[in-house]
UniProtKB/Swiss-Prot annotation:
GO terms for cellular component: cytoplasm. Keywords: ATP-binding, Cytoplasm, Kinase, Nucleotide-binding, Pyrimidine biosynthesis, Transferase. It is found in: Cytoplasm. The gene is pyrH. This is Uridylate kinase.
Length: 259
């Protein structure tokens, strides 16, 4: 199924098929614009360890390091036009990720929600699932293919379409906090939190459309630091990493740990 899988390695994973959401902003690294090659290498190595552990990995990438449609719409650009430009930015990032992944010997497929036949396959749900079953990393670009929808919503949608076990939101921080830990020394990290509390407290894990999609299908979400070595594999193997957002009424609503 995957690059190095055997029955023992795959059975040890808490999450077998995952949708990894990466922000375009995170690709900036120390730059003010564009793509930091060091960040690409880090992400490629993290995904490789996950695939080697037996996981099926699909990725949705944002485009905020290149173009943010919402911001330009606020400055006067037509919103739909700006959003389509943002979709193109996600494809640039998707191609960069594809190259980085292939440089560490991962087999990839880049799929686009809008037609770009020379550089990407069209998004076809059954084809994407088949790629995952064969151990290929599938990168989804161009968001949902529609304006007015964020790449977080694209991640929720694609995660549901490919029957992912969980949506993993890889960020530059260690999870969801009660306050900004860099500004508030008393800030605590949520170890786990019910999705309704995320909505009620407006914790901005994802936009409301994305959260609603996850809520309706009880799709769990984990917010974690993608830049910490082996975090992705540790998470897949069941270690407590980041913040787990769940929809299970039987679980404790929240659990916090010091930042």
């Amino acid at each position: 199924m995957s690059a190095s899988p055997d029955d023992e390695s795959t059975s040890s994973l808490d999450h077998q098929r995952v949708l990894l959401k990466l922000s375009g902003q995170a690709l900036l690294g120390d730059r003010e614009f564009g793509i930091d090659e060091a960040v690409l290498r880090t992400y490629a190595n993290e995904v490789k360890t996950a695939v080697e552990a037996g996981a099926e990995v699909a990725v949705v990438i944002g485009g905020g390091n290149i173009f943010r449609g919402v911001e330009h719409a606020m400055e006067g650009m037509t919103r739909a036009h700006a959003d389509y430009m943002g979709m193109l930015a996600t494809m640039i990032n998707g191609m960069a990720l594809q190259d980085a992944f292939e440089q560490v010997d991962l087999v990839t497929r880049l799929q686009s929600s809008i037609k770009m036949e020379e550089i990407a396959e069209p998004f076809i749900r059954r084809r994407a699932i088949r790629h995952l079953e064969k151990g290929r990393v599938v990168i989804f670009g161009a968001g949902t293919g529609n304006p007015y929808f964020t790449t977080d919503t694209a991640a929720a949608l694609r995660g549901l379409e490919i029957d992912a076990d969980v949506i993993l939101k890889g960020t530059r921080v260690d999870g969801i906090f009660t306050a900004d830990p860099e500004e508030d020394a008393s800030a605590e990290r949520f170890k786990q939190i019910h999705g309704q509390e995320v909505i009620d407290r407006d914790l901005r894990v994802m936009d409301m459309t994305a959260l609603t999609l996850c809520q309706e299908s009880k799709m769990p979400i984990v917010v974690f630091n993608m830049g910490t070595s082996n975090n992705l594999r540790r998470l897949l193997e069941g270690e407590t990493v980041g913040t787990h957002v769940h929809w299970d009424e039987a679980k404790a609503s929240t659990e916090r740990v010091p930042a």
